[in-house]
Amino acid sequence: MRSIRRLRDGLLEQEISQLQKAGYHVLQQDIQGGKLWVLTVLAPEQKTGTGPLTLSITLPDSYPLLPPRVTTSDLTMGHHQHPFAEDLCLIERSTENWIPEWHLAGLLDNQLKRAVAAGQAAPGEGLDEFEQGEPFSAYYTYSESAGFLIDSARMDLSVGTSGDLQASIAYGAAGRLLIILDQMRTGRQVAYEAPDGLHTAFEPYRPSALSGRWIILDKPPATNDPKDIWRLAREADSASTWPNNFPQNPGAPALEVRAVGFPEEHGRDVTGLGWFLVLKEHGTIQQAKKGRGKGSPTVLKTPETHKLVRAFRAGHSDLSYRTPETHGLEGKSVAVIGCGAIGSVLIEHLARAGVGRFHLLDQDILEPGNLARHAGALDSVCLDKSAAMAHRVRQINPYAQASPMKFHVGLPALVDGQSETEILEALFTSVDLVVDATVEVGVQQYTSLLAWDTSTPWVSLEGTPGIGGGTVVKITPDADGCFGCFQRHQRAGSIPEATAVHSALVQPVGCAAPTFTGAGFDLSVIALQAARVIVGALMRTTPSGYPEDGYDAHILNLRNEDGQPIPPVWQGFRVTRHPECGSHDV
């Protein structure tokens, strides 16, 4: 295999020669910093279809495996050109559309005239273009230290409208400033109300209130300068009074915010509103040190700044837009018994899929050592595992409800005068599906019978010793067999057992009981398959929902008979009624 450096030997000279032979004029060549190739090329009218164009072509280190950057200041097009950086869109964004054999001359010959024609055409002229929109909001340069959270589905507003806004600000991970849009008003009428769940996720960050203004312009601002955009929005807005959001205390900036909306493409021939926030910081009050014997210190003020803050769409429909087959999960509820290593990974992915309500049961506490396999994080250690995963669910999907419960299945005691059977039966009848992630055969037998009695779909998942393999079993009320049938089929050999790697248990220091060994990434394979099975079962009656695979039992092998790792191998089986199973006796 040739190295990238050998691949580029003599390439610049070859590119220049091919451009000249194809009828382009190379006006200048430069090597920035001795490494980055930049060519200034004149493309004649017959190559552009519009007149001569001076092109600046930058070849990255990864060229010719990745495409060049081509810009021109001779054109201003509404499409297929970056409005500020002036890049020409000659090919679709994915690198699979770049053909290295084209070289520069071939790229320009094949794409330049087409891109110019498409960029200068009126909307709907039927040119052969990729089916995507060009949202203008994607072209601005935003602050990397802040984000503006909105719900797309609630932004049905008209051009020219304006009003007051209320927001909450919080400092999230890595000190990032998060501004959550709470409400927008036009006079006394509410024009936008944030969804309830969005605040829940940020309550641990203790958000503060923030007031400001909003306006919808008739077109995107044609400048990338935040200060100029602030001025444009202020001139278009009828309001002249502003709240003082923060006192001018030492170290605390006074903030003003304007949310700016404008029409833009959201898809091919689909128009919606683009948004961003302009954040104005009036500067912080700082006190210079007082010189000895010189009276009061001098009060200094840092300069005011303006920032563009990108709008991040965080409504319920925004979170599920990329997964259409899971639409409807927001109305489903699951009970998960066991929030340990395998259960936690499953819970995380069910939350990402959009399950609307979780009842989480576990008896244990999350320890730092658990994090090698557990889906929790260091900020959740010392919590009950059920509480840690309820917190994780809300971090992932603020619209999901998660109820943790410290619960020990098999504990010989009453809870508020109720037996565990009464508690679990009431829980099972209130949910759409029960998951047993305890990896305890006695508990599996118990919960499967309770699910059978309450006609509740039931799924169990577990890894074998050493995580050489794993098992996922689904039993629904209309199934032919039950979990007892599955166990008997395995003992009879009609359903195989997953590979096990028999190694000694380990007892970490301070832990009350030994635990199995094995890597979290192996365990996750089982949890992910269980998520597929569960989502399929929950979406069974939903048109175009995530489909079931048609199996009741799923057996995984991750190791061969010698204990060597192999690519994951799943086998699926139907669990038929076993003649020796007494659970079906009337």
Predicted regions and their residues:
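Glycine-rich phosphate-binding loop and adjoining beta1-alpha1-beta2 segment
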Residues: 363-401
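Glycine-rich adenosine-cofactor-binding loop
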Residues: 325-365
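A short, basic/flexible loop-to-alpha-helix module at the beginning of a structural domain
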Residues: 307-334, 422-425
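Compact alpha/beta protein-protein interaction domains typified by the UBC
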Residues: 25-95, 100-106
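Start-of-domain signal
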Residues: 1-35
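Domain-level detector for trafficking modules
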Residues: 81-139
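A structured beta-alpha segment of the ubiquitous adenosine-cofactor-binding alpha/beta core
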Residues: 390-432, 438-441
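Glycine-rich phosphate/adenylate-binding loop
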Residues: 137-296, 300-301, 420-586
